[in-house]
């Protein structure tokens, strides 16, 4: 079930299809790749965990280790991206890894991490939908989605720039955005489990660093 969930939710190493599936108009991309289709994998895994009895810890280890690998991979892959929609594809890959991370932590007994992961499914859907619609607005207005050509967005198009800023702060989990509360639960649950497990503590720290780096990177385009 976990392997199938990785494929449906574009987790490493089964991520290849998502960045190449961005040719649709942005409202379609917002619905399929932001709000619905890619969420099926994490929903199936969450349902499986909720309905199962005792789950072997190896399932949790595989889930959280692959989640951290996917976070870092997604972050490194969207750094060189120039096309905003491809950037959002890799961002989605990384954000869904947060959900898998929280679900994996629940195997070790963290109900808080599980709740945060499920909440993040919905929060990310709204946030990423806004980002895709911003990409569509820019493409319609400027005739391009290439990031170097839209740098300094806040000065040129303040309304769209504000929308971009809201989406960027939400993706990063800056309070009072809804994603702050879901990420906070995942991270808090991770540190609670990590108090008795050094490896998990380190993995949670990596997640925090990746979250901060993501926000810093998005700020450069505003």
Predicted features and spans:
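Hydrophobic transmembrane alpha-helices and their helix-loop junctions in integral membrane proteins
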Residues: 1-221
């Amino acid at each position: 079930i976990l392997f199938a969930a990785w494929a449906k939710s574009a987790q490493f190493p089964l991520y290849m299809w998502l960045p190449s599936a961005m040719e649709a108009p942005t409202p379609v991309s917002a619905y399929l790749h932001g709000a619905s289709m890619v969420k099926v994998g994490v929903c199936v895994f969450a349902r499986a965990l909720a309905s199962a009895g005792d789950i072997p810890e190896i399932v949790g280890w595989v889930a959280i280790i692959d989640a951290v690998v996917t976070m870092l991979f997604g972050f490194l892959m969207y750094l060189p991206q120039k096309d905003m929609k491809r950037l959002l594809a890799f961002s989605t890959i990384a954000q869904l890894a947060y959900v898998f991370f929280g679900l994996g932590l629940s195997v070790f007994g963290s109900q808080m991490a599980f709740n945060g992961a499920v909440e993040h499914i919905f929060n990310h859907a709204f946030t990423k939908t806004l980002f895709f619609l911003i990409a569509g607005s820019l493409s319609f207005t400027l005739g391009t989605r290439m990031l170097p050509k839209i740098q300094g967005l806040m000065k040129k198009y303040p309304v769209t720039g504000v929308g971009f800023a809201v989406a960027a702060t939400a993706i990063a989990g800056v309070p009072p955005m809804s994603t702050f509360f879901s990420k906070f639960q995942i991270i808090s649950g991770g540190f609670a489990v990590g108090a008795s497990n050094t490896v998990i503590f380190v993995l949670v720290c990596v997640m925090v660093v990746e979250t901060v780096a993501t926000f810093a990177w998005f700020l450069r385009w505003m």
